[in-house]
Amino acid sequence: MAVAIAAARVWRPNRGLSQAALLLLWRPGARGLARSHPHRQQQQFSSLDDKPQFPGASAEFIDKLEFIQPNVISGIPIYRVMDRQGQIINPSEDPHLPKEKVLKLYKSMTLLNTMDRILYESQRQGRISFYMTNYGEEGTHVGSAAALDNTDLVFGQYREAGVLMYRDYPLELFMAQCYGNISDLGKGRQMPVHYGCKERHFVTISSPLATQIPQAVGAAYAAKRANANRVVICYFGEGAASEGDAHAGFNFAATLECPIIFFCRNNGYAISTPTSEQYRGDGIAARGPGYGIMSIRVDGNDVFAVYNATKEARRRAVAENQPFLIEAMTYRIGHHSTSDDSSAYRSVDEVNYWDKQDHPISRLRHYLLSQGWWDEEQEKAWRKQSRKKVMKAFEQAERKPKPNPNLLFSDVYQEMPAQLRKQQESLARHLQTYGEHYPLEHFDK
């Protein structure tokens, strides 16, 4: 409109134009055209005064053909608080957490590590059908969980068991879910590691990759409209960030100004695909500004860096109603799952480096030792105690029966429709006739 007005001010009416044509050219505010006179001196016009008015972007005109080159600047820096020996680098960034809270961080990570080892071996022995470990990524879980309010809603992917662990989710329920027994909150309907807990505001995990991202945005939008003073945090891996749902979620969150934290665990591999084959840009954090999202990249093996970033993101997300993106750089030490053999696509030396030289548990242990809050005797006692606790829950879960097969048909409708009741009756007749072919003794009566 401004360009049209400027042009109108220097335009001389052609005597051949009718009065009607002149009226069609005039618009409110274009006074120069309405008052123009053939003998009035033209105003000087400079292209420097021509400012972009396009509604889609805020920018300046340039007169040189130049494409934007990828990675022309150095990569987004990685924020950290502790070095690999657990020493605080910049005292002003020390969160100064009390001893009790730091010990809870450490015990949550080590308890998760112990549970992982036992359940991984139980799958290898055929006791459960599937499992996914969290080796190497424990710091991203508990560091972020500690910075949230307990009522903040969590949407996980499938490798965030530490968030529930920090929220005091009982070991018995972890085991019940993996075994699919009668104590499982999901009534045995989900495959292992698909946890969920309404009381702890942890939305049940679903297998399809990245579906939780737009769902989390919807929940955050609802929280905003309800003035709930809560944030939604959505976890995902860098592989899931390549899914279309990630784009939809990022864009909706930015345009609807939702109080959400997108937490990306960049662990180096999307199953067997390394990051070098996943994207050419500067990781995931670099995508945030393009959507209008505040973004940061942190050392995911530094639990304090994760804590600080999440705490500040939460504060601002609630206060300002805007999304934040945290990319936590870490490494998946374990196999993708019990269905994967990572030795086929990475070296043992590579894995050993991260396990021995830059493990989040080791880093926090160094910090505790330097503070005088932990010693080797306490370490041995806790490791023994944690294993005993996990084994007790493990043995209890193994002894409990599976849910009654009739529960397959419940919790779908408030009142069971005729078609579903017909299927239930059909299953009952089938089991009555051929029950000896099924391990019904393992199911609740």
Curated annotation (Swiss-Prot):
Which cofactor does this sequence's record say it needs? thiamine diphosphate; Mg(2+)
Q: Which InterPro entries match?
A: Alpha-ketoacid_DH_E1_comp, DH_E1, THDP-binding
Keyword S-adenosyl-L-methionine present in the record's keywords: the answer is no
Q: What is this protein called?
A: 2-oxoisovalerate dehydrogenase subunit alpha, mitochondrial
The compartments listed are: Mitochondrion matrix
What molecular function terms (GO) are annotated for this protein? Answer: 3-methyl-2-oxobutanoate dehydrogenase (2-methylpropanoyl-transferring) activity; metal ion binding
- Binding-site list for K(+): S206, P208, T211, Q212
Signal peptide feature range: none
EC main class here is: oxidoreductase
* A Pfam entry, by short name: E1_dh
Q: Which residues carry this modification: N6-succinyllysine?
A: K356, K380
Q: Which branch of life, at top level?
A: Eukaryota
Sites of N6-acetyllysine modification? K356
Q: What CDD domains does the entry give?
A: TPP_E1_PDC_ADC_BCADC
Regarding protein family, the annotation reads:
Belongs to the BCKDHA family.
Q: Where is the transit peptide?
A: 1-45
Function comment: Together with BCKDHB forms the heterotetrameric E1 subunit of the mitochondrial branched-chain alpha-ketoacid dehydrogenase (BCKD) complex. The BCKD complex catalyzes the multi-step oxidative decarboxylation of alpha-ketoacids derived from the branched-chain amino-acids valine, leucine and isoleucine producing CO2 and acyl-CoA which is subsequently utilized to produce energy. The E1 subunit catalyzes the first step with the decarboxylation of the alpha-ketoacid forming an enzyme-product intermediate.
Posttranslational modification: Phosphorylated at Ser-337 by BCKDK and dephosphorylated by protein phosphatase PPM1K.
Q: Which residues carry this modification: Phosphoserine?
A: S337, S339, S347
The alphabetical list of record keywords is: Acetylation, Magnesium, Metal-binding, Mitochondrion, Oxidoreductase, Phosphoprotein, Potassium, Thiamine pyrophosphate, Transit peptide
* Main subcellular location: mitochondrion
The residues listed in the UniProt record as binding thiamine diphosphate, with positions renumbered to this chain, are Y158, R159, S207, G239, A240, R265, H336
Assembly information from the UniProt record = Heterotetramer of 2 alpha/BCKDHA and 2 beta chains/BCKDHB that forms the branched-chain alpha-keto acid decarboxylase (E1) component of the BCKD complex. The branched-chain alpha-ketoacid dehydrogenase is a large complex composed of three major building blocks E1, E2 and E3. It is organized around E2, a 24-meric cubic core composed of DBT, to which are associated 6 to 12 copies of E1, and approximately 6 copies of the dehydrogenase E3, a DLD dimer. Interacts with PPM1K.
**Catalysed reaction equations from the record:** N(6)-[(R)-lipoyl]-L-lysyl-[protein] + 3-methyl-2-oxobutanoate + H(+) = N(6)-[(R)-S(8)-2-methylpropanoyldihydrolipoyl]-L-lysyl-[protein] + CO2
List ligand-binding residues for Mg(2+): E238, N267, Y269
